[in-house]
Amino acid sequence: MERVGCTLTTTYAHPRPTPTNFLPAISTMASSYRDRFPHSNLTHSLSLPWRPSTYYKVASNSPSVAPYCTRSQRVSENTMLPFVSNRTTFFTRYTPDDWYRSNLTNYQESNTSRHNSEKLRVDTSRLIQDKYQQTRKTQADTTQNLGERVNDIGFWKSEIIHELDEMIGETNALTDVKKRLERALMETEAPLQVARECLFHREKRMGIDLVHDEVEAQLLTEVDTILCCQERMKLHLDKAIAQLAANRASQHELEKDLSDKQTAYRIDDKCHHLRNTSDGVGYFRGVERVDATVSVPESWAKFTDDNILRSQSERAASAKLRDDIENLLVVTANEMWNQFNKVNLSFTNRIAETADAKNKIQTHLAKTLQEIFQTEMTIESIKKAIKDKTAFLKVAQTRLDERTRRPNIELCRDMAQLRLVNEVHEVDDTIQTLQQRLRDAEDTLQSLVHIKATLEYDLAVKANSLYIDQEKCMSMRKSYPNTLRLVGFC
């Protein structure tokens, strides 16, 4: 800035700019004392009595800065600056020592800041390296633990797979023996089993066909003679069913455990091979605070071991039951001869009676279906007629509605109005008549449909009875079973 006045106090027209750096640029410092104070032009001949004029410059006029004077003291450009009586106003604010001390302070602060920054950088670099090595070691330890966990899971998984294969094999073997026992009871075990299956299937007859006929009497006689074999087979069959349920429950636990092990193996193996550069890594805030674990390594291993022990126990019981069933089939295969021909003759007579009744029902059903078709056609024609009349009714009512909007005296009850009203009543009566006829036709159709349903049900009953007697029962009794079939092989 331009200094004006005496050496006692220096007055500036504007405040000193705040430096943005520790040391301002030389150009800034040099220019800060030039042409900063616009004032009225002072002639070069102006002399200041208390200071030689060679040490001061005459202030130049700057259009960007207002003169340093009050409103009442403003003068024109050609007016000279009067002498100021207050000498203290023009003295400088700082001494050279202050200036040097300020610079020295800035230098020291700069050195201190740079020293602290350098120390921080060195410490930070060392900290980064230490933490990097520590993090890598921690990750390596975690990776090793994951690898050990994967090996543990793999061991128990192989144990489960081995036991599961054994259990599946035993379950399949018991299932085969059970099927042989069922075949002996239902299809191939001598007269007792044939009679038992025939009675069982004939209980599936429906409606009026559930009669106590000659066939049932002969079958009951056949069953009574060999009831003891039947009870023994059913007892062992129930045991086999219960054992299969136990085997499947144990197998289910093994399969569930194996599925969990496979999932855990896949997850832990993925985690074991996961690296910093792997795809799919990301931030999951707060996941380390979520403890969703439900077991410890000891309880985890004991859980799988208990499942394997339970499976082994069930396999031993299943093998013993298979041996008992095998012995039972061999014993009961030699105890079966009774009333075979009488039962077959009774079946033949009953099948003929049922077939004749079925043919008559089919004839009535065909006629009923034809009548239903005709009635449905009538209903459709009535509906079409009603729909056609509805269009006429809409037009007439629309005309009446539009004519209600005639203004004032134009609302005349003329011939057109009367004809429209009559037309609405006439069409409405026609629709009502057709709707009544439609209801009558629908009632008739419902009656026909009910009769059809009754005939169809009766036909299904007869067809079911024929299927049971002819296909189910007689197919089992076409020939006497041989020894292999009596023990369940066929």
From Swiss-Prot:
It is found in: Cytoplasm, Cytoskeleton, Cilium axoneme; Cytoplasm, Cytoskeleton, Flagellum axoneme; Cytoplasmic vesicle, Secretory vesicle, Acrosome outer membrane. GO terms for cellular component: acrosomal membrane; acrosomal vesicle; axonemal A tubule inner sheath; axonemal microtubule; extracellular exosome; microtubule cytoskeleton; nucleus; outer acrosomal membrane. Expressed in spermatozoa. Expressed in airway epithelial cells. Its main location: cytoplasm. One of its GO terms (biological process) is flagellated sperm motility. Residues 424-451 form a coiled coil. The keyword Translocase does not apply. Disulfide bonds: none annotated. N- and O-glycosylated. May be proteolytically processed during the epididymal transit of spermatozoa. Keywords: Cell projection, Cilium, Coiled coil, Cytoplasm, Cytoplasmic vesicle, Cytoskeleton, Flagellum, Glycoprotein, Membrane, Ubl conjugation. It is a peripheral membrane protein. Transmembrane segments: none annotated. Glycans are attached at residues 7, 9-10, 41, 86, 103, 111, 276, 344. It comes from the Eukaryota. Belongs to the tektin family. PANTHER family: TEKTIN, TEKTIN-3. Microtubule inner protein component of sperm flagellar doublet microtubules. Interacts with TEKT1, TEKT2, TEKT4 and TEKT5. Interacts with CCDC38. Microtubule inner protein (MIP) part of the dynein-decorated doublet microtubules (DMTs) in cilia and flagellar axoneme. Forms filamentous polymers in the walls of ciliary and flagellar microtubules. Required for normal sperm mobility. It is linked to Spermatogenic failure 81: A male infertility disorder due to oligoasthenoteratozoospermia and characterized by reduced progressive sperm motility. Patient spermatozoa exhibit acrosomal hypoplasia and detachment of the acrosome from the sperm head. This is Tektin-3.
